């Protein structure tokens, strides 16, 4: 099962190919009448502008309506769609050769635009950012992190002296990126890769075990970063202005974290 969220809607995709579309405002009532359809998707299905963006056959992203029928708009080449996220600019898919940006044009039609990866570092498989901001970030192999300014359609490589395992763009005026390194430290990087903030190792046990490392999640808001710690059963709330751990929530078994409200 895979959930993909955009704005006030979430698609839940099952291995059978069934897609359930959830409207957040309706979740307090019932989900019995929510749209359900079966699609042959090879990646995350993104709800966007009252349509669904569907990676198909591993090579393109098609646009369908909420009934599953083809909808007006441009399909886009995308091999190996591995992730999808929304920004203030539009919906972004992570593909083998780069990102693909979908935007809504005047009149409602959707347009697709490729943003190819530069060649100086491995491409990310996921891109993450603060909700409703113009930037996304992802890990660039063992070299550092990629920062994607979606508004400018520009990639910036943030080199790191230690490998990184998570990267999330803040999308603020300073174009900062919050990352988790292989030692379990949270760092805040400037657009040139300078380390502005560095914490003590917070997740030493979690990052040392591959199975637990895969469960670690990092999400950010305007003031804090939230970091799950599966080994200790905790979630750390970190002030990303100075690296101070503001709070730690304990007695948990964190598998998924999402900001709401």
Residue spans for each PLM region:
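Intrinsically disordered, low-complexity segments enriched in Gly and acidic/Ser/Thr residues
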Residues: 147-230
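Repeated scaffold domains used in trafficking and secretory/extracellular systems
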Residues: 1-8, 36-50, 75-89, 120-133, ...
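Feature marking well-ordered beta-strand scaffolds used for ligand recognition
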Residues: 10, 18-32, 60-64, 69-72, ...
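Structural recognition of the beta-propeller blade-terminating site
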Residues: 21-26, 62-67, 102-106, 149-151, ...
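Acidic, serine/threonine- and glycine-rich low-complexity intrinsically disordered segments
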Residues: 54-172
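Short beta-strand elements that form the blades of beta-propeller/WD-repeat-like
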Residues: 2-21, 44-62, 84-94, 98-101, ...
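Blade-level signature of beta-propeller repeat domains, shared across WD40, Kelch, NHL, RCC1
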Residues: 230-261
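A short beta-strand motif characteristic of beta-propeller blades
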Residues: 1, 27-38, 69-77, 110-119, ...
């Amino acid at each position: 099962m895979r959930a993909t969220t955009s704005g006030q809607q979430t698609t839940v995709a099952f291995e059978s190919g069934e897609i359930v579309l959830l409207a957040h405002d309706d979740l307090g009532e019932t989900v019995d009448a929510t749209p359900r359809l079966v699609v042959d998707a090879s990646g995350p299905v993104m709800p966007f502008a009252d349509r669904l963006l569907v990676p198909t056959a591993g090579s393109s992203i098609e646009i369908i309506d909420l009934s599953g029928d083809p909808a007006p708009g441009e399909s886009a080449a995308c091999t190996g769609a591995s992730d999808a996220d929304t920004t203030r600019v539009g919906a972004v898919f992570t593909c083998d050769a780069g990102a693909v940006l979908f935007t809504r044009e005047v009149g409602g039609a959707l347009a697709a635009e490729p943003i190819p990866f530069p060649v100086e570092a491995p491409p990310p498989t996921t891109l993450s950012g603060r909700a409703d901001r113009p930037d996304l970030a992802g890990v660039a192999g063992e070299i550092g992190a990629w920062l994607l300014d979606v508004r400018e359609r520009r990639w910036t490589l943030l080199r790191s002296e230690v490998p990184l395992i998570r990267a999330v763009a803040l999308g603020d005026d300073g174009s900062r990126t919050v990352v988790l390194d292989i030692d379990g430290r949270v760092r805040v990087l400037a657009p040139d890769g300078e380390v502005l903030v560095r914490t003590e190792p917070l997740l030493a046990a979690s990052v040392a075990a591959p199975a637990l490392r895969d469960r670690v999640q990092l999400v950010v808001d305007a003031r804090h970063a939230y970091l799950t710690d599966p080994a200790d059963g905790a979630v750390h709330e970190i002030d990303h202005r100075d690296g101070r751990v503001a709070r730690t929530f304990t007695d948990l078994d964190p598998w998924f974290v999402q900001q709401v409200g």
